[in-house]
Amino acid sequence: MMSKLICVARIGAAHGVRGEVRLWTFTEDPLAVLHYGPLTTKDGSRSFEVTKAREAKDHLVASFKGITDRNAAERLNGVELYVPRDRLPETDDDEYYHADLIGLAAETTAGAPLGRVLAIHNFGAGDIIEIAPPSGSTLMLPFTNAVVPTVDLAGGRVIIELPDEIDGEDRASADESASAEDDAAAPNSARHPRESGDP
């Protein structure tokens, strides 16, 4: 069975004239991309080997094998780079790869279905879990032990304790989402999510 692919980096604009590029990594240690072996596009049609990288503000400046001039580097702008999930290190307790969370069923502590995990975000004030209900607006909740007390990867679900701040229309929307999914079909039954980990 093929291992799930994890996006570990995205290539940005060219840097200089010798084929270097700006590289945004999604790893806990930005330089970990040097240790994962060949990186590929999502469809596997292209492979890239990072030959060197250095830190620069909020990104890396990196070189790839075979990319030696600015024109070649410019053509890579926007390319996302992936590695197989089994090539990454195991996570610690209460740490999760984003890709392992996306798609999990979300339920309330009372067992009512809410929808599925759509994404994990961080806008600078902590991690946010986005839940997509069967209909209506998505729910954006803090990804903390208090709000998400249980992550059951084996069972394919997360348990959500809806915070008191979700009231009025938002709380009603969440309750309606749970009710709507009940009527359809029940799904199969401080956190630190990360897109990838240290080598």
From Swiss-Prot:
<keyword id="KW-0698">rRNA processing</keyword>
<comment type="subunit">
    <text>Binds ribosomal protein uS19.</text>
</comment>
<dbReference type="InterPro" id="IPR056792">
    <property type="entry name" value="PRC_RimM"/>
</dbReference>
<feature type="domain" description="PRC barrel">
    <location>
        <begin position="93"/>
        <end position="169"/>
    </location>
</feature>
<dbReference type="Pfam" id="PF01782">
    <property type="entry name" value="RimM"/>
</dbReference>
<comment type="similarity">
    <text>Belongs to the RimM family.</text>
</comment>
<dbReference type="InterPro" id="IPR002676">
    <property type="entry name" value="RimM_N"/>
</dbReference>
<dbReference type="Pfam" id="PF24986">
    <property type="entry name" value="PRC_RimM"/>
</dbReference>
<dbReference type="GO" id="GO:0006364">
    <property type="term" value="P:rRNA processing"/>
</dbReference>
<dbReference type="InterPro" id="IPR009000">
    <property type="entry name" value="Transl_B-barrel_sf"/>
</dbReference>
<keyword id="KW-0143">Chaperone</keyword>
<comment type="function">
    <text>An accessory protein needed during the final step in the assembly of 30S ribosomal subunit, possibly for assembly of the head region. Essential for efficient processing of 16S rRNA. May be needed both before and after RbfA during the maturation of 16S rRNA. It has affinity for free ribosomal 30S subunits but not for 70S ribosomes.</text>
</comment>
<protein>
    <recommendedName>
        <fullName>Ribosome maturation factor RimM</fullName>
    </recommendedName>
</protein>
<feature type="region of interest" description="Disordered">
    <location>
        <begin position="164"/>
        <end position="199"/>
    </location>
</feature>
<dbReference type="GO" id="GO:0043022">
    <property type="term" value="F:ribosome binding"/>
</dbReference>
<dbReference type="GO" id="GO:0005737">
    <property type="term" value="C:cytoplasm"/>
</dbReference>
<keyword id="KW-0690">Ribosome biogenesis</keyword>
<dbReference type="GO" id="GO:0042274">
    <property type="term" value="P:ribosomal small subunit biogenesis"/>
</dbReference>
<keyword id="KW-0963">Cytoplasm</keyword>
<dbReference type="InterPro" id="IPR011961">
    <property type="entry name" value="RimM"/>
</dbReference>
<dbReference type="InterPro" id="IPR036976">
    <property type="entry name" value="RimM_N_sf"/>
</dbReference>
<dbReference type="GO" id="GO:0005840">
    <property type="term" value="C:ribosome"/>
</dbReference>
<dbReference type="InterPro" id="IPR011033">
    <property type="entry name" value="PRC_barrel-like_sf"/>
</dbReference>
